[in-house]
Every structure is written in C-alpha cells, then in structure tokens.
C-alpha cells in the first residue's frame, strides 16, 4: 500500500472514474445499506475547495470536525504514529527541528497533494461506528479498484478537520458528516 503525495496534473477520464466508482458502490456494508455518499470535485471546483481549506488552516482557525478527532495514541499505536511521521519527513529530507518545513509539508494535505480530483466520503452522523466501518470498507475497495487501473490515491483524514468549506460547497445538511 502506498499513500501517494504527488500527483500528475492530468485528470482521469470521466468514464474511467465513473466505472470505478460504480464498481466500488457494490462494497459490502452492514445490513447492505451502503450508507456513504461520495462527493467528487475536479477542476475549478476542486481548486476553490482547496483554496478555502488552505485559507482556514493559514488563518489558524480551530479545527471543527464532525466526528471525534481528539485521539491521543498510546503504546504501540503512538510508536507507529511517530515511526510513520519520521519515515515521511525523512523521505522529504525534512529534519525534526525544521518546524516551518514540516508545516509547509502538512499544508499540502489541504491542497490534496495536487491530485486532479478529490473524493470526499460522507455519511449520516447517527450511523456512528457502524457507518465508519462501512466507509472504511468502501474506501479500501475504492483504493484497490483505483490501483487496479494504475491510478494512485491517498486517504486523508486531515480533510475532516475543517468540514465547513466542504459542507458549504456541496450543500450538506447538518445530519451528514
């Protein structure tokens, strides 16, 4: 598995994307309800969303996620978290003490790592943990189908920190997160 953090500028053909998303829609879910909604932004819409998200981060707005974001990893999970961050920043030749470079690298999350498309997964909030499990299954299926077609992807939890611009752009009701 690879989380791609640098993408080609060329968009994926619409019919290819539609076929992949259609196939992914058949992912299993609890009681076969397929509770996810997938919102895809490309072109000018994606750029507008990127700009709004970066503006939120640059203005140091406080994250306002729809779901619990305040997870403090402990034990082996914390070790893996630090190991992952160390591997990432080492690959980018950014030292631990280079805070500004780390912040700039982190900012690329909200620029979607320059991917030509961004897919955002939402679900009704009341579905809680079962909905999260279903979205995880869907996300894995989508990732594998994309890879099968030679298309890289990167699952980004960071985007959930600032749902406001996404909610506004796609006119999401309050009960969806």
Which residues make up each language-model segment?
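Acidic, surface-exposed loops and disordered segments
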Residues: 1-177
